[in-house]
Amino acid sequence: MPKFAVITGASSGIGAEFARQLSARGYELMLVARREDRLRKLSAGLTTTCEIFPADLAKKSECLRLVKELQGRRIDLFINNAGFGDCGMFLDTDLDKELEMISVNVRALHILTKQVARILCKQGHGALLNVGSCAGLMPAGPYMATYYATKAYVVSLTSALAQELREARSPVYVGCLCPGPVNTEFNAVANVEFALRGITPEYCVRCALDGMARRKTVIVPNPVVAAGMTLGRFLPRPVYIKIAAHQQRKKLYKR
């Protein structure tokens, strides 16, 4: 029986690459995103059965509609990937865009994490991967304040749930992918250019799948970022935040 995976934010970037690599491994897929045309174009190039589920996960009702669709179905893997960012001084960035970001990056992820984890635990197997960011591992992110805050939520929530399931001796895997810069259309949406060289989506997803196989709770695919995270543990918090601000300002100047 083929395995079944659900991928949100599947129309581009990391989500689309998860679809390609999982299809190559024989997974049947449900692809979720706002842009139906992109989902259909992606599915046409895949080798396994793909269901298209257009949804705007910024809306609570759409999240619950997806959950309802999944009730009673065997889920082997759920990739919680939908999300976006923004860059600029907090006093200048657009409030409506930030509230939509919080709706997608936090509320939608929270709803789907809770409801899908319940399904996985009830069926007694499966894996849930939340796509966070290395931003969520840092104390704060001046000039990307809201985005960093949303990703800190993702890392914290995922880590807590993973520990609860371990203590309950559940076979269900829960993990968080925390990439640094990845060469996708994230830049255009966030109105930013990376200060560090990005990795490819292909490499990012390979590392994610390998980390899941090893049941790592937090997966950091970029070795430069991973080294920075390790060194950052020895820095005073204010110093770390100043360094983060310096790196973020580079992005602003590149625009």
Predicted ranges, named:
Residues 25-41:
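Conserved glycine-rich Rossmann-like NAD(P)H-binding loop of the short-chain dehydrogenase/reductase
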Residues 54-65, 95:
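The beta1-alpha1 cofactor-binding region of Rossmann-like NAD(H)/NADP(H)-dependent oxidoreductases
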Residues 81-86:
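Conserved NAD(P)H cofactor-binding loop of Rossmann-fold oxidoreductase domains
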Residues 89-90, 97-102:
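Substrate-binding pocket helix/loop in short-chain dehydrogenase/reductase
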Residues 133:
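Residue(s) in the substrate-gating loop at a strand-loop-helix junction
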